[in-house]
């Protein structure tokens, strides 16, 4: 079992990081950041509006983080050379996405390629917080597994949400059928990502959410780290920073290793790994980077199918073997299926049920998927709930230290505070994929609307403490052009977990993803198209 940062390779001291990019340069209030890979990377930027001052009864001034180098000392000619070399490296090494202006770029490989939006140089991140995030990852992995086994907890916690959220209701129906059949998942695989921000007000590393399905960018995030290491080896002396402070990021390798071990546990050498994908996916190269490791390192056949194709081509045999297109499936790896848009018809829901009824290893199972929901995360933050699943008091304290404030809308006092000071809260629906959160005065308006409509609608949302990170000046590169912005970053730490009955085979921190957006944007309406990938520079 891996713990701490041991699963990443270091040279002396190292670092890992990632960033997000926008086209506006006006600094303003920041927000916690949940970015959909398919939206924030591939849509055209729009001009951002300055945000209104927070109506919090106090003046909040965002603090700028001390840069690891002085951008003003880098002349334009030097920066242009860095950008040129970065774009060449990206093109040669596959740090690319599909260009939305090309019609076939989402389903025909090699058509309409462009470099992924990137931070030109890595972002400073305190080493102590980096180690904290690494150290708790195996604990969160174990927590997810234990929660997933408590079917009553999942059903009870989400029972009210089921009444107001059709998507969650359909997932719960599948879960309920598995409980009725007493269906056991002897082999359980989770490829997770835990997202954090550094809160300037409390000087704490606070978790934004746990992601248990379709955790994107293990491939591209690894490449961004390698890109930054390459640039710093060439230009670090001139800039005044050391490439050895950027940690080696092995996210794709470790995810592929976990998938391969799950495939081995299934014990059918002729079976394949099936990746569930969207019909159009301009982030396909991130997915193919992982698939290529499975083929080349582990000699495993990988197939890609949409849920509609699984329903059309799939069946479950008497021994519960999943057959798709005439091939037995050992592992089902979801890179789709996390939003209602991924289930436009009954065909997709039939496929989800078919997969769940089979003996294939699911990544994630329906129980793991539900465990990652916003409501379950809010329930876990309640006093005494972690103790239901974990015994070690020190481990529980480590996890609780990462929790931001999370509340049900049944808490009338918190709702009152959020109406009075909406800038201190984020309102989150039961949705994955980004672009759904509610900020600022919209929090007040939605809470007042729900009060008029009655309490039933409350179950569709939770309230979270709004996190205010420090701001960094950064060069952000999109479509071959760099811009300087004040930006904020979000650290995602990957975790891999594999269990076969009573044996834990894998439980480790598995690399990282850094994303950044400009400080003036909220998520909703402006986050799409304003993100870049980045890496960490440990300080």
UniProtKB/Swiss-Prot annotation:
Pathway: Sulfur metabolism; glutathione biosynthesis; glutathione from L-cysteine and L-glutamate: step 2/2. ATP binds at residues 209, 374, 428-437, 439, 464-467, 490, 517, 523. The gene is GSH2. Binds 1 Mg(2+) ion per subunit. Gene3D superfamilies: 3.30.1490.50, 3.30.1490.80, ATP-grasp fold, B domain, Glutathione synthase, substrate-binding domain superfamily, eukaryotic, Glutathione Synthetase, Chain A, domain 3. One of its GO terms (cellular component) is cytosol. It comes from Arabidopsis thaliana. The lineage of its organism: Eukaryota, Viridiplantae, Streptophyta, Embryophyta, Tracheophyta. Disulfide bonds: none annotated. GO terms for biological process: glutathione biosynthetic process; response to jasmonic acid. Its cofactor is Mg(2+). This is Glutathione synthetase, chloroplastic. Coiled coil: none annotated. It is found in: Plastid, Chloroplast. Belongs to the eukaryotic GSH synthase family. SUPFAM superfamilies: Glutathione synthetase ATP-binding domain-like, PreATP-grasp domain. Transmembrane segments: none annotated. Substrate binds at residues 193, 213-216, 281-283, 287, 335-338, 515, 526-527. It is an enzyme of class 6 (ligase).
């Amino acid at each position: 079992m891996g713990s701490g940062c041991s699963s990443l390779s270091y040279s002396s001291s190292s670092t890992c990081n990632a960033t997000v990019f926008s086209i506006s340069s006006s600094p303003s209030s920041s927000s916690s950041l949940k970015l959909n890979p398919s939206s924030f990377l591939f849509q055209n930027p729009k001009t951002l509006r300055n945000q209104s001052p927070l109506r919090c009864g106090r003046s909040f001034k965002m603090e700028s983080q001390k840069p690891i180098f002085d951008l003003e000392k880098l002349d334009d000619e030097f920066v242009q050379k860095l950008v040129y070399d970065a774009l060449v490296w990206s093109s040669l090494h596959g740090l690319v996405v599909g260009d939305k202006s090309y019609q076939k770029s989402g389903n025909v490989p090699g058509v309409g390629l462009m470099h992924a939006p990137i931070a030109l140089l890595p972002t400073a991140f305190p080493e102590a917080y980096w180690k904290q995030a690494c150290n708790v990852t195996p604990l969160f992995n174990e927590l997810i597994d234990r929660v997933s086994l408590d079917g009553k907890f999942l059903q009870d916690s989400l029972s009210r949400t089921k009444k107001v959220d059709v998507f969650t209701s359909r997932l719960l129906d599948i879960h309920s059928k598995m409980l009725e059949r007493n269906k056991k998942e002897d082999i359980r695989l989770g490829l997770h990502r835990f997202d954090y921000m550094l809160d300037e007000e409390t000087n704490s590393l606070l978790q934004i959410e746990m992601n248990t399905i379709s955790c994107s960018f293990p491939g591209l995030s690894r490449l961004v780290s390698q890109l930054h290491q390459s640039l710093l080896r060439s230009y670090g002396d001139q800039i005044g920073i050391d490439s050895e402070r950027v940690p080696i990021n092995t996210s794709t390798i470790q995810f592929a290793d976990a998938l391969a071990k799950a495939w081995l546990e299934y014990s059918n050498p002729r079976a394949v790994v099936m990746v569930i994908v969207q019909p159009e996916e301009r982030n396909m190269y991130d997915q193919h980077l992982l698939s290529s490791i499975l083929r080349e390192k582990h000699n495993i056949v990988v197939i890609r199918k949409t849920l509609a194709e699984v329903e059309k081509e799939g069946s479950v045999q008497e021994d519960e073997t999943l057959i798709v297109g005439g091939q037995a499936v050992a592992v089902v790896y979801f890179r789709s299926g996390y939003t209602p848009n991924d289930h436009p018809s009954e065909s997709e829901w039939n496929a989800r049920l078919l997969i769940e009824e089979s003996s294939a290893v699911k990544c994630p199972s329906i129980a793991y998927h539900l465990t990652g929901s916003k409501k379950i995360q809010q329930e876990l933050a309640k006093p005494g709930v972690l103790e239901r699943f974990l015994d070690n008091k020190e481990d529980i304290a480590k996890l609780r230290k990462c929790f931001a404030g999370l509340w049900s809308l049944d808490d009338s006092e918190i709702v009152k505070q959020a109406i009075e000071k909406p800038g201190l809260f984020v309102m989150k629906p039961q949705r994955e994929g980004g672009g759904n959160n509610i900020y600022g005065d919209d929090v007040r308006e939605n809470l007042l609307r729900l009060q008029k409509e009655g309490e039933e609608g409350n179950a569709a949302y939770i309230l979270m403490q709004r996190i205010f990170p420090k701001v960094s000046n950064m060069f952000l590169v999109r479509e071959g052009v760099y811009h300087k912005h004040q930006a904020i970053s979000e650290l995602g730490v990957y975790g891999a977990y594999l269990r076969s009955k009573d044996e834990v085979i894998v439980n480790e921190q598995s690399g990282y993803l850094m994303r950044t957006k400009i400080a003036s944007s909220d998520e909703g309406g402006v986050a799409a198209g304003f993100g870049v990938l980045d890496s960490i520079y440990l300080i």
